[in-house]
Amino acid sequence: MDDPTRIDPTLESLRRAWEGQPNLSLPTFFAMLANQGIGWGATDAELVAELERQAGVHPPLLPLEGGRIAAGEWLVLADAPTYRITATPTHIIVRRPDTQPVVWAYESIRPTGPGRPFTIRDTEGFEHRFGVVSSLMRLS
């Protein structure tokens, strides 16, 4: 018999990975896993490794340390209104339809993820609200 204590950590890995892509139905998410070779013959360890990889690309929360991007560059898609925002450890690049991109330094980002509001405080202390996050994706 397999160790039943493996179930909770496996389900937690599934939760984190799926929360990073909440627009997908669970069957669609499982189909994506199948495209990566995770099917009937996969081990729990292989499943957890793929779920962790998925959560690394599309995390449930933007990885922050002290209100700033912890590492890498991230694409944040936000709706209502539509924004494409690139966040780095030091700068924000905001792109909207039919406008020029804007780049500025920031002080902090509030904790955010899909389905949550996206708010950034600039270096002058002003808070900028960018709607609701629909997707996070690691760029580098």
Which residues fall in each region the model found?
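Actinobacteria-biased recognition of intrinsically disordered, low-complexity terminal regions
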Residues: 1-6, 140
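Short, charged early-sequence alpha-helical segments and their helix-coil boundaries
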Residues: 36-66
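N-terminal non-globular leader segments, chiefly Sec-dependent signal peptides
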Residues: 4, 23, 32, 123-126, ...
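Amphipathic alpha-helical segments that form the core helices of the histone-fold
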Residues: 15, 29-42
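N-terminal accessory interaction module
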Residues: 64-140
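Structural motif
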Residues: 18-25
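Basic helix-extension-helix modules of the SAP/HeH family
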Residues: 4-13, 38-40
